[in-house]
Amino acid sequence: MAAPEEKALQVAEWLKKVFGDHPIPQYEMNSRTTEILYHLSERNRVRDRDISLVIEDLKQKASEYESEAKRLEDFLMESVNFSPANLSKSGSRFLNALVDSAIALEIKDTSLASFIPAVNDLTSDLFRTKSKSEEMKLELGKLEKNLTATLVLEKCLREDLKKAELQLSAEKAKVDSRLQNMDFLKAKAAEFRFGIKAAEEQLSARGMDASLSHRSLAALSEKLSELKEQTIPLKKKLESYLDLMPSPSLAQLKIEEAKRELDAIEAELTKKVDMMGL
């Protein structure tokens, strides 16, 4: 089997031979089109070889018939003193036509018994040739359709590939952008951690109480919220005492007790707030 390079070279030589001095139509060179054109060139080469053999055979037959005609002419001249030169123009024309027909039909003589079978065979050959020609036309039409469909499919695939490459490029750009953002965020996070650590070390060196750190302040804020929640029922309890009409001394005692509890809670609350303000 011929290599792809040899096939491409043979196709180029065949196209140059077919089109001669005319320019070869542009076509896309790929393995599919090269294979199709290679098979066509092979068939053309086989057909040319067969035609050459037929021509050589006909030349040989013509030479044989010319020799036979010369022999018959000599025989006529010797036997009946007959010469084609003695024929009229129409007679010479008919005789030449008869000889040419005999040569073309490849028959041994010009008798009717030889002409009729030869004409029948020639007619059969003509029908077979026409049938073969129609088959080749149909096959060539199929090949052209397949070639067209292949070229269209190849064009579609190229367009799809181009779209996929563009989409891949866009996705790659997005990924690169996200990676850059991620690297930036990582760098910022490391910078913040380093800054926090440096600030903590600096504050610790200045003697700052660890209880005033952000975490401790957040815990104090939660504790403050809890204390505020605890004062709510005490305030309600105090309000309920204010609404009653007991003995003045007992009521005053309860009020003072509630006020002391409330003052203690508010004092603790104020202390916590002051610490948070620092």
UniProtKB/Swiss-Prot annotation:
Keywords tagged on the record: Cell cycle, Cell division, Coiled coil, Cytoplasm, Cytoskeleton, Microtubule, Mitosis
UniProt entry tagged with the keyword Coiled coil: yes
Keyword Transferase: no
Coiled-coil regions, chain positions: 49-79, 128-178, 249-277
Any GO CC annotation of this UniProt entry: cytosol
Biological process according to GO: cell division; centrosome cycle; spindle assembly
Main location: cytoplasm
Cell compartment(s), UniProt: Cytoplasm; Cytoplasm, Cytoskeleton, Microtubule organizing center, Centrosome; Cytoplasm, Cytoskeleton, Spindle; Cytoplasm, Cytoskeleton, Spindle pole
Assembly and oligomerization: Component of the HAUS augmin-like complex. The complex interacts with the gamma-tubulin ring complex and this interaction is required for spindle assembly. Associates with microtubules. The interaction with microtubules is strong during mitosis, while it is weak or absent during interphase. It is unclear whether this interaction is direct or indirect. Interacts with EML3 (phosphorylated at 'Thr-882').
Membership in a protein family: Belongs to the HAUS1 family.
Function of the molecule: Contributes to mitotic spindle assembly, maintenance of centrosome integrity and completion of cytokinesis as part of the HAUS augmin-like complex.
Protein name: HAUS augmin-like complex subunit 1
Annotated source species: Mus musculus (Mouse)
Protein encoded by which gene: Haus1
